[in-house]
């Protein structure tokens, strides 16, 4: 099996926030349990990007669930990649689906889903959901745990 050091290039050193999501380096590490179906979850409760029209900040909670195959995403590189959206202008749907697709291209997981729970803009919350196909029946798939947005009342 490949060593972690050859794949986790940013781990253990000071790494600046990438200038853009495209410039961000996502790292992967070998999955020591590639023979086992299990779910890994990442939750980013303070995700930010910019509206591509107004430049105003948009805020979301992202929940990424995946069933790994040979590769795991290295969490520091994922944190830096998601942080690179802070000054990136894109619509909610583009951010959410684009993140999911980039992870699928990197990891080639057995299954992946992403939920983007966006705070209201113009009084309308936008939730975006994307997945690669049917979830595996052998894996416990908990609810993403993000309550529907409720205004006052």
Curated annotation (Swiss-Prot):
This is NADPH-dependent 7-cyano-7-deazaguanine reductase. GO terms for cellular component: cytoplasm. It catalyses: 7-aminomethyl-7-carbaguanine + 2 NADP(+) = 7-cyano-7-deazaguanine + 2 NADPH + 3 H(+). Its main location: cytoplasm. It comes from Methylorubrum extorquens (strain PA1) (Methylobacterium extorquens). Substrate binds at residues 73-75, 92-93. The active site is at 51 (thioimide intermediate), 58 (proton donor). GO terms for biological process: queuosine biosynthetic process; tRNA modification. Signal peptide: none annotated. It holds the Pfam family QueF. The keyword Cytoplasm applies. Belongs to the GTP cyclohydrolase I family. QueF type 1 subfamily. Catalyzes the NADPH-dependent reduction of 7-cyano-7-deazaguanine (preQ0) to 7-aminomethyl-7-deazaguanine (preQ1). GO terms for molecular function: preQ1 synthase activity.
């Amino acid at each position: 099996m490949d060593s972690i050091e050859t794949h986790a290039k940013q781990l253990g050193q000071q790494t600046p926030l990438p200038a853009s999501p495209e410039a961000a380096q996502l790292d992967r590490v070998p999955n020591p349990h590639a023979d086992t179906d299990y779910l890994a979850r990442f939750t980013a409760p303070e995700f930010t990007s910019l509206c591509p029209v107004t430049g105003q900040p948009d805020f979301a909670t992202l929940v990424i669930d995946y069933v790994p195959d040979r590769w795991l995403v290295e969490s520091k590189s994922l944190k830096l990649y998601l942080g690179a959206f802070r000054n990136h202008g894109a619509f909610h749907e583009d951010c959410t689906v684009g993140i999911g697709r980039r992870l699928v291209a990197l990891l080639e997981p057995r299954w992946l889903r992403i939920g983007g729970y966006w705070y209201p803009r113009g009084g309308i919350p936008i939730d975006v959901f994307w997945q690669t196909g049917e979830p595996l029946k052998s894996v416990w798939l908990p609810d993403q745990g993000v309550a529907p947005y409720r205004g006052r009342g």
